[in-house]
Amino acid sequence: MRGAFLATAAAIAGTAMADIAHMRRHGHDSFHQRRAVEQPAPEADATCGCTTEVVTSWGPPTLIPIATSSPSSTVTSEVVTTLHSTSYSTVTLVVTPSGASPNRESAPATPAVTLPTPGVTSFSTTGTYTIPATTLTVTHSTTVCGATTTELPSGTHTYGGVTTVVDRHTTVVCPYATVEPSGSTVTSVIRTTTYVCPSAGTYTIAPTTTYVPTSTVIVYPTPATITPGTYTQPAQTITVTRDNYIYVCPFTGQQLPTTAPVAPATTAVPATTTAVPATTTAVPATSSVAPSSSPSKPAAPSGAVSGQMGMTYSPYTNEGGCKDKASIISEVALLKSKGFTHVRVYSTDCGSLEFIGEAARTSGLRMIIGVFIKQSGVAGAQDQVTAISKWAQWDLVSLIVVGNESIQNHFCDASTLAGFIVSAKQSFKAAGYSGQVTTTEPINVWQANGDALCGAVDIIGANIHPFFNADVSAAEAGKFVAQEFKTLKGICPGKDVINLETGWPHSGEANGKAIPSREEQAIAIKAIADEVGSMSVFFSYFDDLWKQPGAFGVERYWGCIENF
């Protein structure tokens, strides 16, 4: 599907038709076909393996103060309501040395200790509530289950877990927090897992995957080490404006002097380990936990390219689920520091408008937003038009792209797409939008359907990928894309051109002179940025490991943020 040979390049006309027929259709066609009902799950990594050893000792539950129904001394405008509180229990991890067997009968009894784990309070109704202050003193270091929250839009999400970065093949042994049934409730526990990192990269160990039908705030446990010190949970007056609101009240601490080093929370391994952030409402009952990983290639040196306009961003995990809000906001914010002015999103799913929009506003980025057309055709995309019109944060939007290679993928014909673009433009205008609207297709589709499409769009949108032309090397990528610009301008006279997808893969099989590698990717991207970077959107932020391999096995490996 990637760009075509130029009609004017007579010297290579003999091979152009073969390239159009064979090379322009590849795994990119299924950019958003990631759900189980639309596409098979990503292939499992045969080199990864992991075993889990559960070594758990149950301890007393963490105590959380519960306000009584008697009037509080705090003066508020509403009556203080009794709090309905829940908490995660405190669990002490006891690791049995390798080769030894646990002897539960000989284990000494341990006195109950109250530890400063965060208080999780559920407010069933609106009102003003007071949580009294609490002070605790801890004299020994203990690994416990903390708690954190994250907001998830509707859909399938992967969150939590422990992230580790290794520089070579490494076996990592670390604790992770999870929940398991305990009678009619659930209890947080600390488990240990052994994970084999097959090569250098970043891995997420033991994340949780869940499905939420609507936008939800979940609470989930995280491993934490409580060190000796005095911890205070200050008095809090909370005004709750919606029903079933969950509030996490943390402790703040001052560490006590100590003459002995604090025991590490993980087995000594040449790796750095941190808890993965995330935020959401009551813990969904459909959650499942399995040790897994999300490897990525080591980052190449940054700062090689400048002068670029935009970057595509997809809010999906390596498994095809939706990323949490915290991850989306931090990743999008990085684009501004890399010199980008725009972020392009393809659809409205996974909180693309709300979460990416919030990140763009905070970071000072503009957005190129999209209406994605799938196999269901234009009728199935109307709800996205409605969602965008209701969102209506037009001060963030530079361009709306209706359809991404939908003609190339045979999801609709040119006349149907043109009619849908005109209809969508009317809806956006009625909602207050006065900016540009277009679609995006490879150059061969524009050449064949310009008569139908030119009148419907305000600017010509094209996906130009020099890799899929076998006679173009990485060093020639910039000149090739610039020539495609000239050809496209001749299709719709008087209208500008924007390159909405361009880049170069870093892994896969060679396509003639087009060779995928980290080095060639860096060369190609710099060449494109030098020629047409100010009117190009680079593809893509990360590798898309949830995709099928596609033509030349490159479809998953276009991540290029390290080059900027």
Curated annotation (Swiss-Prot):
<feature type="active site" description="Nucleophile">
    <location>
        <position position="501"/>
    </location>
</feature>
<dbReference type="InterPro" id="IPR017853">
    <property type="entry name" value="Glycoside_hydrolase_SF"/>
</dbReference>
<dbReference type="GO" id="GO:0042973">
    <property type="term" value="F:glucan endo-1,3-beta-D-glucosidase activity"/>
</dbReference>
<protein>
    <recommendedName>
        <fullName>Probable beta-glucosidase btgE</fullName>
        <ecNumber>3.2.1.21</ecNumber>
    </recommendedName>
</protein>
<dbReference type="GO" id="GO:0005576">
    <property type="term" value="C:extracellular region"/>
</dbReference>
<dbReference type="InterPro" id="IPR050732">
    <property type="entry name" value="Beta-glucan_modifiers"/>
</dbReference>
<keyword id="KW-0134">Cell wall</keyword>
<comment type="similarity">
    <text>Belongs to the glycosyl hydrolase 17 family.</text>
</comment>
<keyword id="KW-0964">Secreted</keyword>
<dbReference type="GO" id="GO:0009986">
    <property type="term" value="C:cell surface"/>
</dbReference>
<feature type="signal peptide">
    <location>
        <begin position="1"/>
        <end position="18"/>
    </location>
</feature>
<keyword id="KW-0624">Polysaccharide degradation</keyword>
<keyword id="KW-0136">Cellulose degradation</keyword>
<feature type="active site" description="Proton donor">
    <location>
        <position position="405"/>
    </location>
</feature>
<feature type="region of interest" description="Disordered">
    <location>
        <begin position="285"/>
        <end position="304"/>
    </location>
</feature>
<keyword id="KW-0378">Hydrolase</keyword>
<dbReference type="GO" id="GO:0071555">
    <property type="term" value="P:cell wall organization"/>
</dbReference>
<comment type="pathway">
    <text>Glycan metabolism; cellulose degradation.</text>
</comment>
<keyword id="KW-0326">Glycosidase</keyword>
<keyword id="KW-0325">Glycoprotein</keyword>
<keyword id="KW-0732">Signal</keyword>
<dbReference type="GO" id="GO:0009277">
    <property type="term" value="C:fungal-type cell wall"/>
</dbReference>
<dbReference type="GO" id="GO:0030245">
    <property type="term" value="P:cellulose catabolic process"/>
</dbReference>
<feature type="glycosylation site" description="N-linked (GlcNAc...) asparagine">
    <location>
        <position position="404"/>
    </location>
</feature>
<comment type="function">
    <text>Beta-glucosidases are one of a number of cellulolytic enzymes involved in the degradation of cellulosic biomass. Catalyzes the last step releasing glucose from the inhibitory cellobiose.</text>
</comment>
<keyword id="KW-0119">Carbohydrate metabolism</keyword>
